Amino acid sequence: MSASSIARTVYIVSDSTGITAETFSQSVLSQFDQVDFKPIRLPFIDTLQKAEETAERINKNAADTGVPPIVFSTLVNPEILARVRQANGVFLDLFGTFVSHIEQALGLKSSPSIGRSHMQADSEKYRNRIDAINFSLAHDDGQFVNQLDQADVILVGVSRCGKTPTSLYLAMQYAIKAANFPLTPDDFERSSLPKTIAPYRDKLFGLSIQPERLSEVRNERRPNSRYATIEQCRYEVAEAERMMRRAGISWLSTTTKSIEEIATTVLQEVGLGR
């Protein structure tokens, strides 16, 4: 962000966790890279007293900065919604904007419910998500390999290319049982996939990364080590990509991609659309 960038406060207001509004706001605000947005999440605004306090906070920010803050809302209760809407902010009602149009299209009235977009702790979907998270944690970095046949996908690549965060994101967001397995210099010397994962060729998806970026990441973990040198990184990346091409494994570079983009590509390429 440049020194001359514009600063603007953003309030993310919800009567539940605020995750939906936060995710939407990040996507929208990312289109304005000349603005230094200051996001503040206000979850569980589920009483009129909390709504009043939220409105006062928004008004104070507007008075202090001289500009009304941007307010993203997924409030459901009409009274709470009305009170926060009265505050001096640029108010964006995410549910109201879309629900009314869908009501017209369907010829039906919606049945508002707080937190409905998120899973209940006793639901089957929630339990599947927890099972997937536990699976991904147990099968991180090739630690446990006895149940790889149960994996939905096995991510492969050199150390520190983004396998672990992608595996956990797939588990948490999509209940995907994602294992990950490292490709090491020993594997490159043998010029073949590790025997542990070779039987699961149809489950494999590769992640790569630019050597320069890999060196930066590894230096944060092991400064001044051979493991982090640009020469070692170039060697490992080149050999890993050669191995994946030879084995016919689809892969992508994680260098400039977010975890969300990587995960979406994995889902599409492996045929795990959710």
Swiss-Prot record:
Segments forming a coiled coil: none
Keyword DNA repair: no
Ligand binding (ADP): G157, V158, S159, R160, C161, G162, K163, T164
Family matches, as InterPro entries: Kinase-pyrophosphorylase, PSRP
Gene Ontology molecular function, alphabetical: ADP binding; ATP binding; phosphotransferase activity, phosphate group as acceptor; protein serine/threonine kinase activity
PANTHER family in the record: PYRUVATE, PHOSPHATE DIKINASE REGULATORY PROTEIN 1, CHLOROPLASTIC
Protein name per its UniProtKB record: Putative phosphoenolpyruvate synthase regulatory protein
Organism: Bordetella avium (strain 197N)
Organism classification: Bacteria, Pseudomonadati, Pseudomonadota, Betaproteobacteria, Burkholderiales
